[in-house]
Swiss-Prot record:
PROSITE patterns: PSP1_C. One of its GO terms (cellular component) is cytoplasm. Residues 644-729 form the PSP1 C-terminal domain. Residues 1-58, 124-170, 200-291, 385-405 are annotated as: Disordered. Residues 149-159, 238-252, 265-275, 388-405 have a biased composition (Polar residues). InterPro entries: PSP1-like (IPR047767), PSP1_C (IPR007557). Transmembrane segments: none annotated. This is Uncharacterized protein PB7E8.02.
Length: 749
């Protein structure tokens, strides 16, 4: 900020200097100026021009736009009788002390200053006033809360000496040069209140930032420094001008909205501020100082990473805020070989690595990969970034699935996101997902280009099933008339992955709810109506009793398959499918709107064995059903058996999934028990069972009275997004199928 020193202050200063030792004004000036060598060398020239200095004139001083100096701060200057060369002198790197007088030697530069001709420096004497506090020069600048050292920018410095106008006795300060002959003039900048409290000042030393020159007029050209090859310094070269460059809006700085006095010395070459001829010859006389009422160009504090951005470095380790870089537009250059392992590949991982990771590790991979990449890049700190706020429940859907921020494959990120949506709704008593709880699904060879978002629309699929199925549950049977669906097979015939933990559930959709799903092997070998060649076994208990066991086995070829907790059911194999099975083999069978996996415990059942199994089935197993409104739905109450098909023999990797299925069932049991305690229901949940394709989740409970668990089922459906069945049992012992007394079964679509 520029300041005008009038005649009154100059005369008062002259009188004060003269009264110090009772000598003349020149002697007082000698005492005030520590540069005795330079002053003695020019003493004769000053005396010869002293008569010209008696003319009434104002000495204007210019302040750099980088400095943060209050409006009221000023510095006393010599009177009109003092030569102008003394005014052009500069302070030392430390500002003047508030307790020192004008005759103190620390207010002017010391005697070691070397003046080199051909360069001149603007008058910075007004940068520090007598009332300004003195920062300790011994202390590093970045530890001081108010002062910092930066490189000044000389608006009047030109590499061409011919650019200097013809000097005159009134403007002898044009011969002033940079101190110490250096291309950089380090000086002190006073920080604003917000910058002084910023944590970035204490993280690392603040680097002086160069601001472009501003004009007192809104549309006056602003000089932008440019660096050209072979130049000594970018600020010593000619600068390009922008014809419509104006001041930008100011931030909350000390000079916001206050007038800034600018010396006409800045605009001697400007066409908007014409000059008049000087009565003494030489350089023209400038107009009086102009008051600039526009906001001052703000000095934006620099963050620790070198960006001209708000200093939010204290948020780097904050769990709520994080810095997000735009990776999609980055063109990586060749990194160093030592840190090459930290850089994530741009391409998706191969098919052999499409397996899940824990969600916490997945989130760290998403958040930390951009930072690790940028840390090893040759130019990492010039990239745009934004501050994003985390959700308390984990990364949002757009954060995990956004390809510009995630370095994982779409399938792994999608599965991690779906698992997080499922587990974050659990109660506090439930355990967090383990390593195997988040399972990827293999990409079907028949649909390699299907968008994962289309395949994984679980909620849309559930809504679609509402319109397909009625509330009353009906067991699937081969007696239904209709054409089999020829959709893409649900499971591939062979899977090269030996450690697969979950199969795909999103690639097939039924066109008819009661039609069974045919595997790729059986669908390729079976004719169109092969599965309907068997007589309708709607009620095997009503078959004629005069059939022999051989005829019975030849006609029906029934098998008994056991599932969890001793639950068993009767199945058959189509005669047109050549499938050789042995006892204790694991088979994939038709189940309730899906597929299940069980162990073969009996084959070629005789009529007596079937009758014995029918007697163990409770009469109300398929009887009373409740819908969501609690209404009783009448069903088939007779003791009948509806066998289903055995699709194929289970693969080894499918059998390995039973271990993970058991772990998921244990977690589901904990969640259900926590929900029961939360709602204070008088019931005891004994066990939980997943259907092998995860399309159905059954909870076995024991209660002494009728339980209204509709709200409980809704809560469980929000967590698992699958059909929930509540099956009542007679007691805590579930070792045999006879112990199951399914008095109430409820499901949710």
């Amino acid at each position: 900020m520029g300041t005008v020193v009038g005649e009154t202050e100059l005369n008062r200063l002259n009188n004060g200097l003269s009264s110090n030792n009772g000598s003349s004004a020149d002697e007082g000036l000698e005492h005030w100026n520590p540069l005795k060598k330079i002053h003695s060398a020019d003493s004769s020239r000053r005396r010869s021009t002293s008569s010209q200095l008696n003319q009434p004139s104002n000495y204007h001083m210019h302040s750099s736009l980088h400095e943060e100096v209050s409006v009221g701060s000023s510095i006393a200057s010599p009177s009109s009788r003092i030569p102008d060369k003394a005014i052009s002198q500069y302070y030392e790197t430390s500002p003047p002390s508030s307790t020192s007088s004008l005759s103190s030697n620390n207010q002017l530069m010391n005697s070691s200053v070397i003046l080199s001709p051909g360069q001149f420096l603007p008058d910075d004497a007004n940068a520090y006033g007598p009332k300004a506090s003195l920062p300790p020069s011994e202390m590093p600048s970045h530890f001081h809360p108010l002062w910092s050292k930066s490189a000044s920018k000389d608006s009047n410095a030109f590499n061409d000496p011919s650019a200097i106008p013809n000097p005159s006795p009134l403007f002898s300060s044009a011969y002033a040069t940079r101190i110490n002959g250096s291309l950089r003039n380090d000086k002190w900048n006073r920080s604003s209140f917000s910058e002084a409290l910023s944590s970035s000042r204490f993280s690392r030393p603040q680097v002086g930032q160069q601001q472009p020159l501003s004009s007192a007029f809104p549309f006056q050209p602003v000089k932008q420094p440019t660096e050209q090859p072979g130049s000594l310094h970018p600020f010593m070269q000619e600068s390009k001008t922008s014809p419509f460059a104006t001041r930008r809006p100011s931030l909350n700085t000390d000079h916001h909205g206050r007038p800034i006095l600018l010396s006409p010395l800045n605009y001697q070459n400007s066409s908007l501020n014409p000059s008049t001829p000087s009565p003494f010859g030489g350089s023209p006389v400038m107009h009086p100082p102009v008051s600039n009422l526009s906001p001052r160009t703000p000095a934006v504090p620099m963050s620790s990473d070198g960006h001209l951005a708000p200093a939010f470095d204290f948020l780097n380790e904050n769990p709520i805020w994080s810095k997000r870089f735009s990776i999609s537009s980055i063109k990586y250059s060749a990194p160093s070989t030592s840190n090459a392992s930290n850089i994530a590949p741009d391409s998706a991982p191969p098919a052999s690595s499409q397996f899940s990771v824990p969600f916490n590790a997945a989130a760290e991979n998403i958040n930390d990969t951009p930072d690790s990449v940028l840390a090893n890049s040759p130019t990492p700190r010039h990239l745009p970034y934004t501050w994003s706020r985390h959700s308390t429940s984990g990364p949002s859907r757009s954060t995990v699935l956004n390809p510009s921020t995630s370095r994982m494959s779409n399938y792994t990120g999608l599965e991690s996101h779906l698992a997080q949506l499922s587990f974050k709704r659990r109660s506090n008593s439930a355990t967090l997902p383990s390593l195997g709880s988040i399972r990827p699904f293999p990409i079907s060879e028949h649909s390699p280009n299907i968008n994962p978002l289309d395949e994984a629309a679980v909620e849309d699929e559930v809504k679609e099933e509402k319109s397909r199925f009625h509330l009353g549950h009906r067991r699937s049977s081969t007696a239904d008339n209709g054409t089999l669906s020829s959709n893409v097979p649900l499971y591939p015939a062979y899977n090269s992955s030996p450690v697969q933990t979950r199969t795909s559930l999103f690639s097939s959709r039924l066109s008819k709810p009661s039609n069974p799903i045919v595997s790729s092997v059986s669908q390729a070998n079976a004719p169109k109506n092969a599965l309907h060649s068997m007589p309708s076994p709607t009620s095997l208990a009503n078959l004629p009793s005069n059939l022999s066991d051989t005829q019975y086995k030849k006609l029906y070829n029934l098998y008994l398959v056991e599932f969890k907790a001793g639950r068993a059911d009767v199945f058959y194999i189509d005669d047109n499918i050549k499938l050789s099975l042995n006892l204790n083999d694991y088979v994939v069978v038709d189940a309730d709107r899906g597929q299940d996996l069980g162990r073969l415990i009996a084959q070629n059942l005789s009529q007596s064995e079937v009758a014995s199994h029918i007697e163990k089935i409770p009469s109300d197993r398929n009887g009373q059903l409740q819908n969501l409104d609690g209404a009783i739905l009448e069903g088939d109450t007779s003791q009948s058996l509806h066998p289903k098909r055995i699709l194929r023999k289970a693969q080894p990797h499918e059998v390995d999934q039973l271990i993970q299925k058991t772990q998921d069932e244990a977690q589901a049991l904990l969640v259900c028990q926590a929900k029961v305690r939360q709602r204070k229901l008088p019931m005891e949940v004994l066990d939980g069972e997943y259907q092998w394709d995860r399309k159905k989740l059954t909870f076995y409970y024991h209660a002494k009275q009728r339980i209204d668990f509709r709200e409980l089922v809704r809560d469980l459906f929000k967590v698992y997004k699958t059909r929930i069945w509540m099956c009542a049992v007679s007691g805590t012992n579930m070792s045999s199928p006879a112990s199951i007394n399914a008095s109430t079964n409820q499901f949710v679509l």
